[in-house]
């Protein structure tokens, strides 16, 4: 998993509340267990017209936001079913940070396991960031995970809070497998001592 230390990029505004995982990645795209290629299905029902052509009114289809790395979204983002394809689709599109006032718990935790930083902010701060994100190609935010700080296009900044363990995992690019490998030497030491103490079980 790629490390997340500092991210600077275009932030796309999505001022919609209760965006569920079916909206993020419709069920038609759940037939694969590959993490790549799902970016085309991200918000598919909103991004595409019935004939499959791009819906030019949807924010991620607008030229200024086609390479967005950050999503500023309404309250309760990622609610609904627990499909891990939702963060996979966001990541495959190129989005590595989602900012909202709240997230569904399962989606929130799945983000960290896939290298995405979900940031919780107050409604006041979200309104400010949503306004910043509405500046089109000038909607540049910098997310500094080391200092827990968001800097806007005007140079103003705001702080956010994050569980220290989750912060450690993102800063070091550690998913569940990576965390286990961090303890590889301790695991190996235990296995050897346990085998010596219980040779009949070896």
UniProtKB/Swiss-Prot annotation:
Catalytic function, reaction form: (2R,3S)-3-isopropylmalate = (2S)-2-isopropylmalate
Residues spanning the signal sequence: none
GO biological process: L-leucine biosynthetic process
Top-level lineage group: Bacteria
Sorted UniProt keywords: Amino-acid biosynthesis, Branched-chain amino acid biosynthesis, Leucine biosynthesis, Lyase
Pfam family, any one: Aconitase_C
SUPFAM superfamilies per record: LeuD/IlvD-like (SSF52016)
CDD domains reported for this sequence: IPMI_Swivel (cd01577)
Enzyme Commission number, as recorded: 4.2.1.33
GO CC terms in record: 3-isopropylmalate dehydratase complex
Metabolic or biological pathway, per its Swiss-Prot or TrEMBL entry: Amino-acid biosynthesis; L-leucine biosynthesis; L-leucine from 3-methyl-2-oxobutanoate: step 2/4
GO molecular function: 3-isopropylmalate dehydratase activity
Family from the record: Belongs to the LeuD family. LeuD type 1 subfamily.
Function per UniProt: Catalyzes the isomerization between 2-isopropylmalate and 3-isopropylmalate, via the formation of 2-isopropylmaleate.
Quaternary structure annotation from Swiss-Prot or TrEMBL: Heterodimer of LeuC and LeuD.
The protein, known as: 3-isopropylmalate dehydratase small subunit
Source organism (scientific name): Rhizobium rhizogenes (strain K84 / ATCC BAA-868)
Lineage start: Bacteria, Pseudomonadati, Pseudomonadota, Alphaproteobacteria, Hyphomicrobiales
